Amino acid sequence: MRFPSIFTAVLFAASSALAAPVNTTTEDETAQIPAEAVIGYLDLEGDFDVAVLPFSNSTNNGLLFINTTIASIAAKEEGVSLDKREAEAWHWLQLKPGQPMYKREADAEAWHWLQLKPGQPMYKREADAEAWHWLQLKPGQPMY
């Protein structure tokens, strides 16, 4: 081995052994904010697909909360050209006299008055219905 490579190896070993540990926690990192100054708090600990961005324009400024999953999908679709769909232009519904608003079923029952016996329910429940529970939606999941 050459002298410069040995010298470099010894210098590297000495510098890494003599380096002082870095203090990652300091008291300057926590801000002392009085309780009266706090307007609100939003916990985003479990939401990994929420980003908070500062926003300002000529009329408004504030914080913008975005769903990063939807934003990344939209960014991928930016290169897709937007073509118009084939659709009829909007117009008022026009019905001729006697024309029905909708078509009936082919095998519909004949019309009759609803007859309920005492104690008879208006409808029957499903045999294997799920137990009642609160609706749970994951972040970014649509309502329907």
UniProtKB/Swiss-Prot annotation:
Sample GO molecular function, one term: mating pheromone activity
Origin: domain of life: Eukaryota
GO BP: mating; pheromone-dependent signal transduction involved in conjugation with cellular fusion
A Gene Ontology term for the protein's cellular component: extracellular region
Signal peptide coordinates: 1-19
Record has Repeat as a keyword: yes
Alphabetic keyword roster: Cleavage on pair of basic residues, Pheromone, Repeat, Signal
Nucleotide-binding as UniProt keyword: no
InterPro entries for this protein: Mating_factor_a, Mating_factor_alpha_C, Mating_factor_alpha_N
Stored Pfam families: MF_alpha (PF04648), MF_alpha_N (PF05436)
Swiss-Prot/TrEMBL domain comment: The mating factor alpha-1 precursor is identical in S.italicus, S.uvarum and S.cerevisiae, except for the number of tandem repeat units: 5, 3 and 4 respectively.
Function: The active factor is excreted into the culture medium by haploid cells of the alpha mating type and acts on cells of the opposite mating type (type A). It mediates the conjugation process between the two types by inhibiting the initiation of DNA synthesis in type a cells and synchronizing them with type alpha.
Name used for this protein in its record: Mating factor alpha
